[in-house]
């Protein structure tokens, strides 16, 4: 099996809603393969929300005007196409806009229901004079890509319901380039630089994560043809490599107390890897292995960046009685009550 060095992904924030991602090192040729796939997916397949139709009080079609409103209906529709919204609902939802003149009508005047957010409230919609009044009902739906107004026209829709072009994609622009990068003596590896700009409804980071998830799902179809087929395997990250090395350590290197060490040895636990595969409950089932020994093991593993199988990631050694955070040492005799017939000085040998 061929093992490739695991690439790293870094993010640089260029501006609000714009980030530059760097993925390196990639096997020769994979920069363009990955860059093109991510770009096309980001631009076409990231889910979003948009206005699909509107109804303006007193208006029967888009080729008309509203009394007291500077903009005609066509201009109002064009402005509403730039509305940036997000919706948590899978079904269509309705928003309402009611404004009395004089003054400017903005997206901030729209009243969205729960689960729907307007992300550009400063956006201009219309201008009203002293006698102007604007009442609009807007339908918002979730989707992806671009859907023209003709496809949003529902059969049997009421008179006055005007379909709108829907731009669901929350991604505005994606560019990428591939540069050469060096790995040891080789200089033909690829470095992919991906520039992503989004609307306010999603961050570039979340958009890229969504694109990656979509591609994994689709490429998984090909993998399912033969899950045993040979391919290039990505090597572990530096942190994972450190953990792999730690798993091979004998428990002798943990410098455990004699009691804890002997209990684990009797149970057949000889390496750190075998130890982290156990839960606290598993260890408590070992004869003479109590809470004090559990705390000791958790502290020793924490110093290696590891934990027991069911230990929470928020484990704090300083909360354990007898632990000195300044020196990283633990007093095994502090803060524990002895149980009946229990001697912590026991030095039972195998």
From Swiss-Prot:
Oligomeric form and interacting partners: Homodimer. The RNAP catalytic core consists of 2 alpha, 1 beta, 1 beta' and 1 omega subunit. When a sigma factor is associated with the core the holoenzyme is formed, which can initiate transcription.
NCBIfam families reported for this sequence: PRK05182.1-2, PRK05182.1-4, PRK05182.2-5, rpoA
Family the UniProt entry places it in: Belongs to the RNA polymerase alpha chain family.
Region (Disordered) residue spans: 326-350
Pfam families reported in the protein's UniProt record: RNA_pol_A_bac, RNA_pol_A_CTD, RNA_pol_L
Organism: Mycobacterium sp. (strain KMS)
HAMAP family the record matches: RNApol_bact_RpoA
Location of region: Alpha N-terminal domain (alpha-NTD): 1-226
Single biological process term from Gene Ontology: DNA-templated transcription
Enzyme superclass (EC): transferase
Top-level division of the source organism's lineage: Bacteria
Keywords in alphabetical order: DNA-directed RNA polymerase, Nucleotidyltransferase, Transcription, Transferase
Gene Ontology MF term list: DNA binding; DNA-directed RNA polymerase activity; protein dimerization activity
Alpha C-terminal domain (alpha-CTD) as annotated region, ranges: 241-350
Disulfide bonds: none
Name under which the protein is recorded: DNA-directed RNA polymerase subunit alpha
Domains (record comment): The N-terminal domain is essential for RNAP assembly and basal transcription, whereas the C-terminal domain is involved in interaction with transcriptional regulators and with upstream promoter elements.
CDD domains found in the cross-reference section: RNAP_alpha_NTD (cd06928)
């Amino acid at each position: 099996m061929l093992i490739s060095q695991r690439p790293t992904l870094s993010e640089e924030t260029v501006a609000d809603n714009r980030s530059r991602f760097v993925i390196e090192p990639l096997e020769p040729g994979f920069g363009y393969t990955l860059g093109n796939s991510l770009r096309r997916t980001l631009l076409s397949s990231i889910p979003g929300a948009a206005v699909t139709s509107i109804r303006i009080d007193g208006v029967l079609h888009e080729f008309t005007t509203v009394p007291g409103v500077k903009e005609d209906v066509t201009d109002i529709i064009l402005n509403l196409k730039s509305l940036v919204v997000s919706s948590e609902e899978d079904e269509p939802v309705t928003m309402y806009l009611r404004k009395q003149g004089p003054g400017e009508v903005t997206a901030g005047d729209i009243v969205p229901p729960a689960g729907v957010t307007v992300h550009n409230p400063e956006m201009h919609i219309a201008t009203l004079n002293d006698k102007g009044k604007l009442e609009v009902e807007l339908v918002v739906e979730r989707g992806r890509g671009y859907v023209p107004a003709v496809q949003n026209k529902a059969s049997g829709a009421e008179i006055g319901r005007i379909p709108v072009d829907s731009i669901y994609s929350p991604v505005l622009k994606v560019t990428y380039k591939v540069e050469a990068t060096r790995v040891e003596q080789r200089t033909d590896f690829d470095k992919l630089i991906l520039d992503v700009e989004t609307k306010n409804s999603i961050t570039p980071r979340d958009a890229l994560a969504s694109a990656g998830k979509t591609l994994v799902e689709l490429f998984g179809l090909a993998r399912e043809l033969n899950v045993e087929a040979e391919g290039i395997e990505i090597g572990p990250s530096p942190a994972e490599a450190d953990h792999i090395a730690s798993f091979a350590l004998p428990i002798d290197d943990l410098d455990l107390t004699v009691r804890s060490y002997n209990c684990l040895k009797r149970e057949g636990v000889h390496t750190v890897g075998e130890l982290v595969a156990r839960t606290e409950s598993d260890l408590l089932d070992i004869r003479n292995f109590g809470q004090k020994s559990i705390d000791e093991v958790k502290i020793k593993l924490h110093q290696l960046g590891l934990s027991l199988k069911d230990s929470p990631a928020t484990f704090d050694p300083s909360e354990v009685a007898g632990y000195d955070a300044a020196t990283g040492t633990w007093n095994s005799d502090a803060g524990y009550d002895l149980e009946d017939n229990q001697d912590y000085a026991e030095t039972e040998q195998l």
